Regions:
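Conformational switch/transducer regions in large eukaryotic molecular machines and scaffolds
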Residues: 1-180
């Protein structure tokens, strides 16, 4: 299910209780696709069979300026944050690729709330661009996907949720009983 949502959506949310297997789900998929990509015939038949690299971060662990971009008040220059650096490097790498030979998954492990996710809405819509405070844009390459690993969507805006593919980890399906 995760693979199919990733094929049609740049951003995907894996939603479920702590310990239900969200991390294991994408790790198994990543390993499987990477292993299948070692088979030249398979790799030629579908560009999803390739090496997958991932970067994982907790968006609530750093200030928003460290995620996207920050202006140095002394030099008056802008510096890319973590997300902007990763996306800018991917954008540059896409310029050298003629065919997708590897994929990048940027995984946000933490709550999805308006304090940091609203800046991702243009990334998640059809334009696939990160708009930064210095008025620059980063075009998100086709080989990149975003995964949001969340416990729930209580504080996520409808605008963000509607732009993402959803994979819900049903507790009963994995043998867990939710609290009443």
């Amino acid at each position: 299910q995760l693979l199919y949502t990733m094929m049609v959506r740049l951003g995907n949310m894996i939603v479920g209780f702590i310990g239900i297997g969200k991390t294991s789900t994408y790790r198994v998929l990543m390993k499987t696709l990477t292993e299948l990509g070692k088979d030249k015939e398979l790799a030629e038949s579908d560009d999803w069979y390739c090496t997958i690299k991932s970067d994982i971060l907790n968006p609530k662990a750093v200030p928003k300026s460290d995620l996207y971009m920050e202006k140095d008040e002394i030099t008056q220059t802008w510096e890319d944050g973590i997300v902007a650096k990763i996306m800018r490097e991917a954008e540059e790498e896409e310029k050298t690729q003629t065919k997708i030979t590897k994929r990048l998954w940027l995984i946000f492990d933490g709550p999805v709330d308006a304090t940091w996710i609203e800046d991702m809405n243009t990334v998640l819509d059809d334009s696939r661009k990160l708009c930064l405070p210095d008025s620059s844009n980063i075009k998100i390459p086709k080989f990149m996907n975003l995964i949001f690993e969340v416990q729930d969507l209580k504080v996520a805006s409808p605008a963000t949720v509607s732009r993402c593919g959803m994979v819900y980890m049903e507790p009963v399906a994995v043998g867990l009983m939710p609290h009443a």
